[in-house]
């Protein structure tokens, strides 16, 4: 089994677990509430000579641990000071060691729009919030 097969397998397990916790209707309601974030993100990167979207992640399947002393709050503040126009937070638990808590913590300390990155492997809409 290669790494992509492993990621897909683990993600399917997590999606099936999530289905028993939150209904698709609840997710859709949350997405409707968050629609203003999409336009905020678009406005922040549109019509910019240089619009950097900085990524925050603790690990990756290929590099394993990227930062032993991972401090996403400090990293977000540094990126914002350096001119990033948006942040991409990896929240995937198993291979990127992210979490929704990291996303929530970073959102409290920055004014930048933050899209949630399940982009490395998104399965059903259930996992996109």
Predicted regions and their residues:
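An N-cap/entry alpha-helix motif that binds or orients negatively charged groups
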Residues: 2-67
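Hydrophobic faces of well-ordered beta-strands that scaffold small-molecule active sites
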Residues: 52-54, 87, 114-117
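Glycine-rich, proline-tolerant flexible connector loops at the mouths of alpha/beta enzymes
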Residues: 61-63, 86-103
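Alpha/beta enzyme core
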Residues: 70-85
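Alpha-helix-loop-beta-strand connector modules within alpha/beta enzyme cores
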Residues: 99-115
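Conserved small/polar residues in nucleotide/adenosyl-binding loops
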Residues: 119-125
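Short hydrophobic transmembrane-like helices used for membrane targeting/insertion
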Residues: 128-129
């Amino acid at each position: 089994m290669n790494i992509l097969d492993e990621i897909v397998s683990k993600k399917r397990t997590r999606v099936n677990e999530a289905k028993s916790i939150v209904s698709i209707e609840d997710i859709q309601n949350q997405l409707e509430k968050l629609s203003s974030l999409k336009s905020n993100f678009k406005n922040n990167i549109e019509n910019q000579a240089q619009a950097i979207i900085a990524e925050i992640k603790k690990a990756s399947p290929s590099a394993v641990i990227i930062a032993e002393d991972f401090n996403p709050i400090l990293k977000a503040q540094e990126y914002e000071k350096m001119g990033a126009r948006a942040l991409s937070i990896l929240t995937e638990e198993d291979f990127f060691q992210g979490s929704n808590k990291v996303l929530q913590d970073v959102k409290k300390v920055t004014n930048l729009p933050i899209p949630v990155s399940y982009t490395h492997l998104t399965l059903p809409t259930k996992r996109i919030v």
